[in-house]
Amino acid sequence: MSVEADGRKLLRVEVKNSQTPIENKPHWIKTRATMGPEYRDMRRRMIDGDLHTVCQEAGCPNIFECWEDREATFLIGGDHCTRRCDFCQIESAKPEGYDKDEPRRVAESVKQMGLRYATVTSVCRDDLEDEGAWLCAETIRQIHQVTPGVGVEMLAQDFSGKQDLLDIVFEARPEVFGHNLETVPRIFKRIRPGFRYDRSLAVLDSAHEAGLITKSNLILGMGETREEISQAMRALHDANTDLLTITQYLRPNSYLHPIDRWVTPQEFDELAEEAREIGFVGVMSGPLVRSSYRAGRLYRQAMEARGERPVMIVTGYRDGAKPAPFAAKE
């Protein structure tokens, strides 16, 4: 190990990663940081509510766009993760105490913001007996209770593949259950040492068996080949995954995995077409797409494919205006 300036010990992989300078982004990756009034209001609400959002912790490039459109993804369980993935800037450390009031506060924030569709994700909590399953389930229940009719997407960890813990989350009935595969088998252990490729596929299949809409994500640019991407997409479809997002890896800092390549917008379009041909009912593919980007649209596509009506959005009125219904088509 080596030591960083602030005294934190660096892992060997972090030292190795840091030898590669941060890469310059191609012109199609760059975004303009426009902090409009809705963004500023959302940021104030996050601070006042003592909430964590994956938008902030993961350095999402869409934060200004999504918050300006009053879309947000909530990170629960704290801001430290018990596992380390080599693409994620959320700090890996022993988390602090268990905040049982967090589900209520998240639900109240969803109501105050007038959100139509909320995505909830969690850090890994291997330090807890239930690995955070109750916290995830209770957050789903609280959002449904406080804002009846709102769509809730749970982007979950794998809970070590323990069926009893997965069932706790499934029984809360999120509109969508997401678990991200992220990469291909050949480099999976290097990128996600705390997870297992086959176990992640089994988690998605289990959610399907529970009657939930399922969703996953693949990150490109970490060393995978084009054929490996196709194989991973087919594996996800074979595991009964309904929805798929395909994204470009953006390296948050020099201690994380170097970028292997920049995938062109044309290749993202080709992958989207291939995914639809494989049989996914909803696909988002692009350099700045993230797993929770336009999540409500993909949910509607899945419901249409099932011949069912999406939930109607009847959440909080804002500035005296009645929220529009969550229509079946964009």
UniProtKB/Swiss-Prot annotation:
Cofactor list: [4Fe-4S] cluster
A GO term for molecular function: metal ion binding
Localization per Swiss-Prot or TrEMBL: Cytoplasm
Top-rank EC class of the record's enzyme: transferase
Domain Radical SAM core residue range list: 67-281
Any Gene Ontology CC annotation: cytoplasm
Pfam families xref list: LIAS_N, Radical_SAM
Annotated cofactor note: Binds 2 [4Fe-4S] clusters per subunit. One cluster is coordinated with 3 cysteines and an exchangeable S-adenosyl-L-methionine.
Enzyme Commission code(s) on record: 2.8.1.8
Binding sites annotated in the UniProt record for [4Fe-4S] cluster 2: 81, 85, 88
Keyword Transferase included in the entry's annotation: yes
NCBIfam families for the chain: lipA, PRK05481.1, PRK12928.1
Protein name: Lipoyl synthase
Organism: Cutibacterium acnes (strain DSM 16379 / KPA171202) (Propionibacterium acnes)
